Regions:
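An acidic/histidine-cluster motif and surrounding catalytic segment
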Residues: 1-127, 137-166
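A glycine-rich beta-strand to alpha-helix segment
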Residues: 130
Length: 166
């Protein structure tokens, strides 16, 4: 598995190891869906100004957000890897052979503010956003009520298995 982390200059999420929590949560999200592949995911930690710019550019929404997910694959159903072809050169890194799932961008400003707002730890908020985004990279969504319920259940199970509670 390749999990790369880039933290923008001057950005910090105090009191946690971003790399460790990212790796643990991402691995558990992949276990949750029984992903049969070694995967590659990149994470960028940034601030509200930068994520707002990216959100406007890619989603047409001129507003800061907590997390953006950029999946590289389309799934028939959430977590269903049966449509992934090992023969598709665009799905796998030619150097490592890892399945390229996508990119995650998280606002450190939002992590800190939401942890305080929801009354839980920064670690819990960060792990939640990683779980949420990893599920998006595996085809989950929350546009419809039934999809949202399925995704929320998955997020909670991942965090529970990691022992991360409110």
């Amino acid at each position: 598995m390749v999990f790369s982390v880039e933290v923008d200059e001057g950005i910090n999420i105090p009191g946690i190891s971003v790399s460790d929590i990212f790796r643990q949560t991402a691995l558990d999200a992949l276990r949750f869906t029984d992903c049969p592949y070694e995967c590659e995911v990149s994470l960028t930690i940034t601030d509200d100004d930068t994520i707002r710019t990216v959100n406007k550019e890619y989603r047409g929404i001129d507003k800061a957000t907590d997390v953006l997910s950029f999946p590289f694959l389309e799934f028939k159903a959430p977590g269903d890897f049966s449509g992934v072809s090992e023969l598709d050169p665009d799905s796998f890194n030619p150097d490592s052979g890892d399945l390229m799932l996508g990119d995650i961008m998280i606002s450190a400003d939002h992590v800190i503010a939401q942890a305080e707002e929801y009354g839980h730890s920064v670690k819990r908020e960060f792990a939640f956003l990683i779980a949420h985004s990893m599920l998006h990279l595996q085809g989950f969504d929350h546009i419809k009520a039934d999809e949202a319920a399925e995704m929320e259940k998955a997020q909670n199970e991942i965090l529970e298995r990691l022992g991360i509670r409110r």
